[in-house]
Regions:
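Bacterial Sec-dependent N-terminal signal peptides
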Residues: 1-26
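Glycoside hydrolase catalytic-domain context in secreted enzymes
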Residues: 19-540, 544-851, 858-876, 885-887
Length: 887
């Protein structure tokens, strides 16, 4: 063995020596942009040491100066706009955009997102120090199936249906990677047509399909969960179709493996999924990245326990096919190779995929060669992109109820706005968001629309409590002194000082420093002041922190979380003040990396009575109650201490009790209520359907959400959104959250009566479907023995105003007793003027009739008698159907 190692070392030295003799003015093969990405990657691989290869397989890949390799950050986010990288256009959350059922518009959105991404990458490149979230690999889209509304990260997905998820996911990938809407390479911008063939076809950005393969909560146990015995039919018909299509039709550059185990093997070391399915069956040529810390889960005490050490975990992941690690375990690659646990050829295979991706981006080439680098900086958060954010926000708002035609409202009415989400700009962004240059809350959107008319705002309650809060920060008569150090230990001379006169609400969003001269990350701060009360008061100290903090009151340490990393649960501590008795407050803050947040206030909490609330409402014609939940309550692995929430997920589906009580009280008092629900998931709002005359599902609508909601409320925009998930009546309608089988889940298998069905959404007009006809046409799929079909039907706007309907096509195989009740296979947005009738044609390719064949263990076109349904929702579609025999 020693002789073998010595021989490899000598060969490596000879290769490096030969390369070193290359003339300085001659391009090396890997530096030549006219060669293929594969040829360049092969050449560069031959020049790298094992230690250098290891560094390049980490998510934060450092520069290797001797070979001119620039630094690269693989971890970047763009679920609904460029995230965590300064100012950017903040589009509505993914679920909101899915509700538009408009993949063509979604493609425009992600073309805009990739424009901003390219412009931002150039800014970072010119700075000479590319940080996390500033490169061109984006871990987007999330094409997991939102199988259970309790999952806190469902807001990142495109809903519960495989077909809708696939259509929307493809639009995202094509927009991000600079491909045409149907997945073909686009002509290089700014390059004459005559020169296109001579120009390397660079990828605009790298998209990533995540989380492969069966992943949708719970958040609290994702690092230990083992999914066992999932039926093959559920796997292939529900959980895998979107991934397969994004690989084969969208040519997605990356796939991210998930945290959990499947049948005992962690997803990031699961050879069945990574090697057999992804690479061998689907032909995936791109790279596989781990989720962050997923490989560490193999060996960390109390987690998966499939490895004893980081070296062993690394060997398992690399050998299975995980090319890139977000984490720290891959630092042990040299030890694993030395121990014979990994063959270096495996390392080379993985690294080649990473290098090919970077060469396709133009990461090694001069800017003048890469046309995407010419996208100007002024596209970032430009007006056109903000208008696009408003457009898709309008299309994704779903009108769930409009009893007695309360909507649309008009400017002449007296409107009172109420509720905890009405004036919350942070809620608009959802999770994994960027930082808008400006945003409009729903309250402000309504006020803007009713200029010249007073619009009163009554908070009435918080999201989860029957109380309202008032800042008492002014009791710091001299403010709070702020001191900053560019280290995490508060050592040495401060780099800045300041005096905080109002509640502290600081973040490094938009690359904003806490004070001039302070680092964006890796710094510390101290805020200190004296409260001077003029009366006895019971208050609370409220803090929102990302990363570590310590709270000291009159010398006593009340909170000590200095070692915390990441967003911590809101800190709320009681504070009793006595008139004339000063209280000294000190807050120490430690910023470790990435996001910095420091929020601090002294709050007076009061509980308004029903009489006080009604007095504020007065004789209003309508109360617009803007409630729901927020990204602080649902999201990725959150520390939450509120009834109904656990670890970022929900334990029930109901609207929080405090809001429910206010809406019921308003109804009992005879007030006409419009309930605007903001959430990333379905809410079981049975009482609200009785106590509110109108209900809008507004999700988390992005930076221009206030304008979009106002336009729908007042009728300037006719709502056309359709639900991408089922709204259930109760959590009791659902199977166990840990059960991944599809039995009684989603509209495809749920046998109960939903509150609002999948695909549902009202309009201010009405539509009527004619009897459909089905025509057999020659299959477009080469070599297919099955036929394609064309479905035709009339659609008429039977109302008094223009509107857009999303016509939905579902199928069911009649003899499939264990199969779906129905499955979405096509949809089309159709805009019609009042009274207009149009013949609508929708293609149903032969793959629409594909399903799992248990006899052959394959997905194939299954012969039989099928019912084909068409309508405005999964429920309405049952009214208009036709049968067809598929051979």
């Amino acid at each position: 063995m020693k002789k073998q190692i010595l021989t490899l070392a000598m060969l490596s030295a000879l290769v490096l020596s030969a390369h070193a003799q290359q003339p300085a003015n001659q391009l090396l093969p890997y530096q030549n942009p006219t060669l293929s990405a594969e040829a360049r990657a092969n050449d560069l691989l031959s020049r790298l040491t094992l230690e250098e290869k290891t560094k390049l397989m980490m998510d934060a890949s450092p520069a290797i100066s001797r070979l001119g390799i620039p630094q690269f950050q693989w971890w970047n986010e763009a679920l609904h706009g460029v995230a965590r990288n300064g100012y950017a256009t903040v589009f509505p959350i993914t679920m909101h955009m899915a509700s538009s059922w408009d993949d063509a518009l979604l493609y425009q959105v992600f073309t805009a997102v990739s424009d901003e991404a390219r412009a931002k990458a150039q800014v970072a490149k010119k700075s000479g120090n590319v940080k996390r979230y500033q490169s061109l690999s984006f871990w987007t889209p999330n094409v997991n199936i939102f199988r259970d509304p309790r999952w806190g990260r469902g807001q990142e997905t495109y809903g519960e249906d495989p077909y809708l998820t696939t259509r929307m996911g493809l639009a995202v990938v094509n927009g991000l990677q600079g491909q045409s809407f149907d997945g073909k390479p686009l002509a290089a911008p700014g390059v004459p047509a005559s020169d296109q063939s001579k120009t390397p076809q660079y990828v605009k950005t790298l998209a990533c399909a995540k989380h492969f393969a069966v992943h949708s909560g719970p958040e609290w146990n994702r690092h230990v969960f083992n999914l066992e015995n999932l039926p093959a039919r559920d796997l292939w018909e529900t959980y895998l179709p979107a991934f397969k299509s994004l690989v084969q039709d969208g040519h997605v550059a990356e796939v991210m493996c998930a945290y959990q185990r499947i049948d005992g093997a962690p997803c990031c070391s699961n050879a069945k999924f990574e090697r057999q399915i992804l690479r061998e069956e689907w032909g995936f040529k791109g790279l596989i990245t781990s989720d962050c810390g997923a490989v560490n889960d193999f060996y960390m005490p109390g987690y998966h326990g499939t490895a004893k050490t980081a070296t062993e975990a690394t060997a398992q992941a690399v050998n299975a096919g995980t090319d890139l690690e977000c984490g720290s375990a891959y630092r042990t690659i040299p030890q694993a190779v030395k121990a014979g646990m990994i063959n270096e050829d495996k390392v080379n295979q993985s690294l080649k995929r990473l290098l090919v991706a970077r060469f396709k981006l133009g990461d090694f080439d001069k800017d003048e060669t890469v046309s995407w680098t010419q996208i100007p900086e002024n596209v970032i958060a430009c007006k056109a992109h903000k208008d696009l954010a408003e457009k898709i926000a309008e299309e994704g708002i779903v009108l769930l109820q409009n009893r007695n035609q309360l909507l649309p409202l008009n400017r002449n009415q007296k409107i009172v706005v109420m509720g905890p989400n009405a004036n919350d700009s942070i809620m608009l962004r959802g999770n994994y968001s960027g930082y808008p240059t400006s945003s409009t809350t729903i309250l402000q959107g309504i006020r803007n629309y009713m200029k010249g008319t007073e619009v009163r705002y009554v908070p009435a309650c918080t999201l989860t409590r029957n109380e309202v809060q008032e800042s008492r920060f002014n009791l710091f008569r001299e403010g709070m002194k702020a001191t900053y150090w560019n280290n995490q230990e508060q050592k040495g001379e401060p780099v800045a000082t300041d005096v905080m006169k109002t509640a502290i609400n600081l973040s490094n969003g938009g690359n904003t420093v806490f004070a001039p001269g302070v680092n964006l990350t890796h710094f510390s701060a101290r805020y200190e002041g004296v409260l001077t009360p003029d009366r006895d008061e019971d208050l609370t100290i409220n803090m929102g922190i990302d990363d570590g903090c310590r709270l000291i009151v009159d010398g006593d340490t009340i909170v000590n979380m200095r070692e915390c990393w990441g967003r911590v649960a809101p800190v709320i501590k009681p504070l009793s003040l006595k008139a004339g008795k000063p209280v000294k407050i000190q807050v120490d803050y430690t910023q470790k990396e990435d996001v910095a947040v420091m929020q601090f206030d002294i709050l007076k909490t009061s509980k308004p009575t029903n009489e006080q609330i009604l007095a504020e409402v007065g004789d209003a014609d309508a109360v617009v109650f803007v409630g729901g939940i927020s990204p602080n309550l649902e999201g990725e692995q959150l520390e939450i201490e509120e009834p109904g929430f656990k670890g970022g997920d929900r334990t029930d589906l109901e609207l929080p009790k405090a809001q429910r009580q206010v809406i019921a009280m308003l109804h009992q008092a005879g007030k006409r209520v419009v309930f605007v629900n903001c959430s990333g998931c379905a809410i079981a709002m049975v009482p609200e359907t009785e106590n509110a005359e109108a209900i809008l599902q507004a999700w988390y609508p992005g930076e221009r959400g206030g304008e979009a909601v106002a336009k729908v409320l007042f009728g300037e925009v006719n709502p056309s959104g359709k639900l991408p998930v089922t709204f259930y009546k109760s959590v009791n309608d659902l199977p166990d959250f840990l059960d991944y089988t599809m039995k009684n889940r989603t509209y495809r298998y749920f046998k109960g009566e939903p509150l609002f069905p999948f695909g549902y959404g009202l309009s201010y007009t009405s539509f009527e479907y004619g009897k459909p006809t089905l025509m057999q046409v020659k299959s477009k799929k080469r070599g297919s023995k099955a036929a394609d079909y064309k479905l035709m039907f009339s659609l008429q706007n039977t109302g008094k105003r223009e509107g857009t309907e999303v016509a939905q096509v579902y199928i069911k195989r009649m003899d499939d007793v264990d199969g779906p009740i129905k499955s979405l296979k096509a949809f089309k947005r159709v805009s019609l003027k009042a009274g207009e009738r149009q013949m609508v044609s929708i293609d149903l390719p032969c793959k629409s009739f594909e399903g799992w064949d248990a006899q052959t263990n394959t997905i194939r076109v299954v012969p039989g008698i099928y019912q084909v349904f068409v309508g405005g929702s999964s429920a309405d579609a049952a009214k208009t159907k036709i049968e067809v025999k598929v051979k």
